[in-house]
Amino acid sequence: MAKQILFREEARKALEQGINQLADAVKVTIGPKGRNVLLEKKFGAPQIVNDGVTIAKEIELADPLENTGAQLMREVATKTNDVAGDGTTTATILAQSMVQEGLKNISAGANPVALRRGIEKTTAYLVEQIAAQAKPVEGRKNIAEVATISAGNDPEVGEMIARAMDAVGRDGVITVEESKSLETQLEVVEGMQFDRGYISPYFVTDTERMVAEYENAYLLITSNKLSNLQDLVPVLERVAREGRPLLVIAEDVEGEALATLVVNKLRGVLNAVAVKAPAFGDRRKAMLEDIAILTGGQLISEDIGIKLENVTLDMMGVARKITVTKDKTTIVTDGSTKAAVEKRVAQIRKQLETTDSEYDREKLQERIAKLAGGVAVIKVGAATETELKDRKLRIEDALNATRAAVEEGIVPGGGATLLHLSKGIPAFKANLNAEEQVGADIVCRALQAPLYQIAHNAGLEGSVVVEKVLEKEMPFGFDALTGTYVDMFAQGIVDPAKVVRSALQNAASIAAMYLTTEAIVVEKPEPKTKTGASRSGGAGMM
């Protein structure tokens, strides 16, 4: 395939066009008065969303050069979403602003490598300042505030997430499901989560979110390593006859056994997903027994005389729902094993009383928490399928933001933190050389962009709002919902520090890479041929 090569200004301009197209589509969603974006779907109804990363993932441009720029921007949103779970639109706006400002300076003769160093040093300084400004999350009120803002100013969602955290604790498991009714409800059920994800990405059922989700599934729980196909076939046949999905939890699944599960899943013969067993050594066996008791199954192990080929359906666990991501597995049960779970918890508590080891004590407490803590399930309801999808995305964002807030604290929201921190950059840049100072100025101007866009989406002149907020001190900012200037903490307009930090770091990283790009190599588009004619002049058949 022939390649197209562009250099210097021409290369950067082509990339910038792609960056701007993606960023312009994403940034209309920021703030309480942000708009929605409609995404066409090849199958089914179009999707109307307000979520930056979902929009970014959908954008594929026809021009390969512009598409490369759009992919760079998509990386900003995806990485921020992976780390913090929210703040993707802010990250996109910051990156676009840094790219535009940087390009102006490079065109005027600035050194790209010095700009990059200036951007990186200023970002490192700002990350320290964000941590210094963060306040720890205190009580239910703060949790509800963070969730409300992240869900697009929906106090009902904020209150529900606060209740869910009350029910299962701050480190507890909270999952989001689609409800059959119009109302959004919260219920606490028996369940467990452990830190192991799918062995192969071919097991995923939702390629957008990269998760495998099944309802009413069987669980094969074994301490053996599965590699031989012959051992597994009888079990797979029994489950396939029932027409229900299967979750395999084993020491490892490899070779023929893994290939068979993947092929059956892809062909639609048997919906299956395989994960490695949690923990190590004796603790692994104990955890597997915990999962077996929770799901009403048995641990299949040759140590206790049960061979894989002899496994019947009543030896297998049953889950109401399973959700497997690349690094976590969540099992939700119907609560029918409650008595057995309580008995198991009492047994672990006895072990806890007799142990002297601090490490063992910690691990036993962890097992009790996993077994007894349960799972809070937020069942999302809406009038239409389109509204349901959008609402579910908003609630997932709010949940991620709340967890991030518990982790690193909260800062004033609505773009106020970044704007106020820009005041410290003139003093900081005295430590940089003249060329690096230009990089610091690029970051300083970019910090105004999120608030500017929030005001713009609310139908106001962004630069006027930015000036008014700059006249005041932290934590003052602009409440776009009411159009007033307020104390952001007092008003409950807060962002998780982790979200603000991740957005800034990822935006700076991509902008710095872009500004030091001197050449692009992309595939040359094939010349269009006339319909029906082959490239060899129509002499294709003899």
Curated annotation (Swiss-Prot):
Gene3D superfamilies from the xrefs? GroEL, GroEL-like equatorial domain, TCP-1-like chaperonin intermediate domain
- An annotated Gene Ontology molecular function: isomerase activity
Q: Keyword ATP-binding on this protein?
A: yes
Q: Where in the cell is it found?
A: Cytoplasm
- One cellular-component annotation, GO: cytoplasm
Task: Read off the CDD domains from this record.
Answer: GroEL (cd03344)
| Pfam families, A to Z | Cpn60_TCP1
The UniProt keyword set, sorted, is: ATP-binding, Chaperone, Cytoplasm, Isomerase, Nucleotide-binding
Tell me which residues bind ATP: T29, I30, G31, P32, D86, G87, T88, T89, T90, G414, D479, A480, L481, D495
Looking at the keywords, is Transport present? no
Enzyme Commission code: 5.6.1.7
Main location (coarse class): cytoplasm
- The protein's assembly and partners: Forms a cylinder of 14 subunits composed of two heptameric rings stacked back-to-back. Interacts with the co-chaperonin GroES.
Q: Which NCBIfam families match?
A: GroEL, PRK00013.1, PRK12849.1, PRK12850.1, PRK12851.1
**Which PANTHER family does UniProt cross-reference here?**
60 KDA HEAT SHOCK PROTEIN, MITOCHONDRIAL
Protein name from the UniProt record: Chaperonin GroEL 1
